Regions:
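Short, glycine/acidic-enriched loop or turn micro-motifs at the edges of active sites
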Residues: 42-43, 72, 157, 218
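Short, flexible loop segments at the rims of nucleotide/cofactor-binding pockets, characterized by
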Residues: 13-19, 41-43, 67-69, 126-132, ...
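Active-site metal-binding motif and surrounding structural segment of the metallo-beta-lactamase
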Residues: 45-91
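Metallo-beta-lactamase
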Residues: 6-9, 88-213, 217-224, 232-234
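Short acidic, glycine/proline-enriched helix-loop-strand junctions
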Residues: 85-88, 220-240
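Active-site neighborhood of phospho(di)ester-bond hydrolases with catalytic His/Asp-centered motifs
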Residues: 38-40, 62-70, 89-94, 150-154, ...
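Conserved beta-strand hairpin/beta-sheet module of binuclear metal-dependent hydrolase folds
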Residues: 2-54, 141-152
Length: 240
């Protein structure tokens, strides 16, 4: 079952909980003249997610399909969506296009350079290249500048059946999850290198009002401070 929550005006969180691993997989539909779906989900999730989208819009209205980095939970169902929605187009960064998407996708993507913006009607999105943050050479995030929503992928990942939105201690949750992952076969799923702090600081400087996280609760507290605190937590946990 997909849980649907409007976390900001016309910004919808579509959450599928994987009981086997105790983790939410969140996908975001942003309504506008040209609707954007951010995260396609796994290929196996396409039937369930597409049914959830139908509760909000006619799927064929989707114009843009985006994600952070080339990974199955991010864009595994991309070609299923492109087949179902003939007018939809992928949108991704230059590295993602050159390394993976140009070959993988059944239609070519709109390619964005670092800092480039595009509009969907009333909204303007900025692509921010964030190599290896959270992970992947091609990683990037999308910042919706109109309402200041940061679609931040795996940053702040935390486990469990959690509320759709919180203004509580999201960094504490993320730190606990990082520490647990470090004790598992999935250790260092997020790296920390000499550029990580600078990248997280640049995201904090965007002054987002909402962090739309892929795994766990979205956050509407002090987002800039949360990003800076996440840098500290990641550095302390991942560089021991």
């Amino acid at each position: 079952m997909t849980n649907i929550t409007e976390i900001a005006p016309d910004v919808y969180r579509l959450s599928i909980f994987n009981e086997a691993i105790g983790l939410q997989f969140n996908h975001f539909l942003i309504k506008d003249d040209e609707p954007l779906l951010y995260h396609t989900g796994y290929k196996s999730s396409f039937p369930e997610l597409s049914e959830a989208v139908k509760q909000l819009i006619t799927p064929k209205e989707i114009r843009w399909i985006g994600w952070s980095h080339f990974e199955s939970d991010e864009c595994g169902a991309l070609n299923d969506w492109l087949a179902a929605v003939p007018t939809a187009q992928p949108v991704c960064g230059f590295l993602g296009a050159v390394v993976s998407v140009n070959d993988f996708a059944v239609r070519p993507p709109r390619v964005l350079q670092d800092g480039e913006t595009f509009t969907t009607g009333k909204r303007r999105f900025r692509f921010v290249s964030t190599a290896h943050v959270p992970h992947g050479w091609d990683a990037g995030v999308m910042f919706e500048e109109t309402d200041r929503t940061l679609l931040c992928s795996d940053l702040f990942t935390h486990f469990g059946v959690v509320e759709p939105m919180t203004n509580g201690d999201i960094v504490g949750r993320a730190r606990e999850s990082l520490e647990n992952m470090q004790k598992s076969p999935f250790a260092y799923y997020i790296p920390y290198n000499e550029r990580t702090g600078k990248i997280l600081g640049s995201l904090a400087d965007l002054n987002p009002k909402l962090l739309a996280t892929m795994h766990g609760s979205s956050f509407n507290g002090n987002c800039s401070q949360a990003l800076r605190d996440l840098d500290v937590a990641m550095r302390e946990v991942l560089t021991r």
